[in-house]
Each structure stands twice: as C-alpha cells, then as structure tokens.
Amino acid sequence: MICIKNGWVHDAVHEEPYIADVLADNGKITAIGKNLIVPQDCEIIDATDKNVYPGFVEAHCHIGLDGSGIGFEGDDCNEMTDILTPQLRAIDGINPMDPTFREAALAGITTVCTGPGSANVLGGTFTAIKTVGKRVDKMIVKKEVAMKCAFGENPKRCYQDKNNYSRMSTASKLREMLLKAREYDRKVLAADSDESKLP
C-alpha cells in the first residue's frame, strides 16, 4: 500500500487541483482525501508542492508496432499487400518489448490505444493496452476499440502504383467495403441464430 501525501491532486473530476492524499493498493487508487488514516506499514510519499495526476491515456499511437530503433524487422505498422485490410488486428503484431512502452510509462502514460498506420483505407483494429508488461494478452484492456480508416494522402502515396490515384478512388473503396459489411450484417440478422443460415 502506498500513500501519496499533501500533493496537488488533479482528478479529472474537479475543475481545479486541490491538496489531498492519494491511497493506492496493488496499483489501484482506493481513496482520495485530506489526512487519510493509513496502515502503519504503508509506504508514504511526500508530494508537498508537487502535482499528482491519474495515469494518462494515449488515444492514438503505433507503440509496439513501428519497431522503435529496430528497423524493418520490427516495423509492423502498415500491411502493404492490400489497400483494404479490416481483418487485421493490432494485437497480432504488437511487440511488448518495444522500448517505447517503457518510455510511455515513465512519462505517466499507463494505457495506449495502438494500431495500424494510415497507409490503407481500412488498416485493421486498434487495441487498448497497458504500457507495463511482457505478454500482450496480459496487457490488454480491451481487444478491439477502433477501426483505422484513412482518407488522406497516405493511401494515395502508398498505392499510386496500384490504381489508387485520388481521394475519389479511396472513398469508392471504403464505400464498397461498407456496403459489403452492411450486407453481411443483414444476412447475420436474417439467420436469427441458425448457424446453417449464417454467411
């Protein structure tokens, strides 16, 4: 158990920071308040004149997929075989030993939403993952949290030699995939739990 005492607490609830103690047990905050009563064996950290924040969440990054300092062997950010790859999952490519996880944790970032880059119109799913750990399956907060979709210059630049010269083409490819997804969803609903009728 740890008690961070007398710090300026920024709790994301109150508009202004306030001086208080923060009690944590096994990495989880259990109490916030002034002059908390703590067990005798509790580790005390004096935070007088210091700021105390909850862990930050990085909403969009490629940590664990872009091979920081490794080069080609660790670069799994973009799958360049097809402009549409919605079936790909970040969790299948994340390297938990990527040094950027430790760098993020040291900067106060406790959770990241990491996933594919923006080369593809649909690049695959992002995952929410903790920045501390050695096994991806033990670090996951939520397996699938977003689908990467890119309309900018990257699909044009990356696939110009494969018949994707304009944003019109990019939009057309996305529209085609969304129509397929809608039709698939319609068939699943029509099957009504009858596995023999599932697409």
Predicted regions and their residues:
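Gly/lys/ser-thr-rich phosphate-binding loops in alpha/beta enzymes
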Residues: 90-148
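Conserved beta-strand scaffold positions in the cores of enzyme catalytic domains, especially
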Residues: 3, 42-46, 128, 146
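A short, polar/charged loop-to-alpha-helix boundary motif
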Residues: 39-44, 67
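Hydrophobic alpha-helical scaffolding
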Residues: 45, 87-90, 94, 160-167
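Metal-coordinating catalytic core of metallo-dependent amide/deamination hydrolases
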Residues: 128-199
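N-terminal metal-binding scaffold of metallo-dependent hydrolase/deaminase domains
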Residues: 1-40, 50-52
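Flexible loop/turn segments at secondary-structure boundaries
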Residues: 64-65, 120-123, 154-158
